[in-house]
C-alpha cells in the first residue's frame, strides 16, 4: 500500500508515546488502536515483537529450525493469541478489545496459509511438562491410543520462508487497515518494532518508517520508580544502572539506514522546531498548519525526575551514566 506505516519504538519508558501522539495529531495520520493523542499508553501494538508473537514464530520456524522447535513456537504462538484476546483498552470511557474480532477471524485464515504439514504428537520436551491431569490421561490412554490420536501437541512444518513473509505482510496490512475508518491516511503504530533490531523486526510491515526514541536515564528511572513498573528495575538504582548499561550496549549501528531515525526525547521537546523538521523530512511529508500538537506540557515535565529521585539516586546515575545524560541546561527551557 502506498500510505506510510510509521512505527515508534523505545527501550522502555523513553517517550515513544510523545512522537506517536505528535503524528497522530496530524490530519494525514490515523492509528488502528487509538483515536486521539491523549498520552494514554494503552494502544501499543506488540503482536509482532512480543515473545510468542509473529517474530518469535518466524525465528523459530526459519532461524532455529527443528521439528520440535516448530511445534514449540507454534504452540506458544497459539497461547499468545489466547492471551491477547482478553486485552482491553478504554476508549471514550468504554472498554473495548485492543484486537478486534476481525483480527482473530483473519488469524485463522493466516495460520492455514503458513502451515504446510500438521499432525499431533508428544515429543519428550512436551511430555516432561505435562500437568498431573494430562500425565494421568496419557498413562491411561497410552495402552490403547497413539500419541497422534491423543492430540497433546500439534506438530507443524511451515511453508517456505518467502511465502511466510509474504503472507505475514498481507495479514498485517489487512488487520491494520480493517481497524481504521479512513484507509487513505498514513498509519502510526506505537511499539510495533524491536528497538534493538528495528529493521529485522519490521519485515512484516509494508512501506514502513521506524522511529527510535531514547531518553535521559534520570527520567527513565524516575518514571519506573513512580509508576512502580512491573517489567523494569525501578526499585533499585544500582540494578537500574547495570540494566541501562546492558541494554544501551546492545544498540546496533542503524543510524545510516534510510528507514530508521533516532530521536532524543528531550531534544525533540526543547528544539521542537528543528527536530520536527528532521522528522518530517525523514518521513517525506509536509508541515501542516492545522497541527495543534502542544509541546508545552512535555517541556514543563522534562525535569520532573528532580522531584522523584533522591540525591543519592541522582548522583549515582549522573556519575555512572554520564555519557547518556540528555537534559539540557535549565536556562535553555
Which positions does each model-derived feature cover?
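A polyampholytic, Gly/Pro-enriched intrinsically disordered region
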Residues: 51-62, 232-242, 307-316
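Compositionally biased, flexible interaction segments
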Residues: 148-174, 323, 327-330
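PAPS-dependent sulfotransferase catalytic domain
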Residues: 2-8, 162-182, 192-287
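A generic structural motif
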Residues: 27-30, 186, 205-208
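Short low-complexity, flexible loop/linker segments enriched in glycine and/or proline
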Residues: 45-48, 226-227, 304
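A short acidic/basic microdomain associated with nuclease active sites
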Residues: 187-191
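PAPS-dependent sulfotransferases, especially Golgi type II membrane carbohydrate sulfotransferases
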Residues: 1-6, 25, 104, 110, ...
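PAPS-dependent sulfotransferase catalytic core
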Residues: 1-163, 298-300
Amino acid at each position: 500500500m502506498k500510505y506510510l506505516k510509521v512505527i515508534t519504538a523505545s527501550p522502555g519508558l523513553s517517550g515513544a508515546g510523545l512522537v506517536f501522539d505528535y503524528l497522530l495529531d496530524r490530519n494525514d495520520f490515523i492509528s488502528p488502536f487509538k483515536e486521539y493523542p491523549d498520552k494514554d499508553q494503552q494502544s501499543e501494538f506488540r503482536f509482532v515483537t512480543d515473545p510468542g508473537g509473529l517474530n518469535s514464530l518466524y525465528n523459530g520456524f526459519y532461524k532455529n529450525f527443528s521439528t520440535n522447535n516448530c511445534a514449540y513456537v507454534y504452540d506458544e504462538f497459539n497461547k499468545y493469541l489466547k492471551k491477547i484476546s482478553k486485552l482491553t483498552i478504554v476508549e471514550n470511557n468504554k472498554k473495548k478489545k485492543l484486537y478486534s474480532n476481525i483480527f482473530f477471524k483473519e488469524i485463522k485464515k493466516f495460520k492455514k496459509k503458513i502451515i504446510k504439514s500438521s499432525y499431533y504428537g508428544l515429543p519428550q520436551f512436551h511430555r516432561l511438562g505435562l500437568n498431573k491431569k494430562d500425565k494421568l490421561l496419557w498413562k491411561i490412554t497410552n495402552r490403547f491410543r497413539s500419541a497422534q490420536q491423543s492430540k497433546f501437541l500439534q506438530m507443524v512444518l511451515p511453508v517456505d520462508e518467502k511465502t511466510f513473509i509474504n503472507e505475514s505482510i498481507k495479514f498485517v496490512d489487512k488487520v491494520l487497515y480493517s481497524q481504521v475508518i479512513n484507509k487513505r491516511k498514513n498509519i502510526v503504530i506505537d511499539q510495533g518494532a524491536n528497538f534493538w533490531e528495528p529493521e529485522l523486526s519490521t519485515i512484516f510491515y509494508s512501506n514502513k518508517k521506524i522511529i527510535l526514541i531514547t531518553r535521559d536515564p534520570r527520567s527513565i528511572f524516575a518514571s519506573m520508580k513512580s509508576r512502580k513498573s512491573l517489567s523494569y528495575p525501578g526499585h533499585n538504582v544500582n540494578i537500574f544502572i547495570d540494566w541501562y548499561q546492558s541494554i544501551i550496549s546492545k544498540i546496533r549501528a542503524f543510524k545510516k539506514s534510510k528507514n530508521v531515525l533516532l530521536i532524543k526525547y528531550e531534544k525533540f521537546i526543547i528544539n521542537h522546531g528543528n527536530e520536527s523538521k528532521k522528522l518530517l523530512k525523514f518521513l517525506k511529508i509536509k508541515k501542516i498548519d492545522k497541527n495543534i500538537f502542544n509541546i508545552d506540557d512535555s517541556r514543563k515535565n522534562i525535569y520532573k525526575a528532580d522531584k522523584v529521585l533522591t540525591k543519592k539516586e541522582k548522583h549515582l546515575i549522573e556519575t555512572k551514566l554520564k555519557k547518556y545524560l540528555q537534559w539540557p541546561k535549565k536556562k535553555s527551557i
